[in-house]
């Protein structure tokens, strides 16, 4: 899980999910996981 100032989709299978005030990117590729906030 990478903590970033700006998260974005890296590939077509990445999904942006908002949980509360946090923004996550989840993907079938575990390297693409990101968190903001």
UniProtKB/Swiss-Prot annotation:
Pfam families: Ribosomal_L36
This protein's UniProt keywords: Chloroplast, Plastid, Ribonucleoprotein, Ribosomal protein
Span of the signal peptide: none
GO-annotated biological processes: translation
Predominant location: plastid
One cellular-component annotation, GO: ribosome
A Gene Ontology molecular function term of the record: structural constituent of ribosome
UniProt keyword Transmembrane helix, yes or no: no
Annotated localization: Plastid, Chloroplast
PROSITE patterns: RIBOSOMAL_L36
Family note: Belongs to the bacterial ribosomal protein bL36 family.
Protein name as catalogued: Large ribosomal subunit protein bL36c
Gene: rpl36
């Amino acid at each position: 899980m990478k903590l970033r100032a700006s998260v974005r989709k890296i590939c077509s299978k990445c999904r942006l999910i908002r949980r509360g005030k946090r923004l996550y990117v989840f993907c079938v590729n575990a390297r693409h996981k990101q968190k903001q906030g």
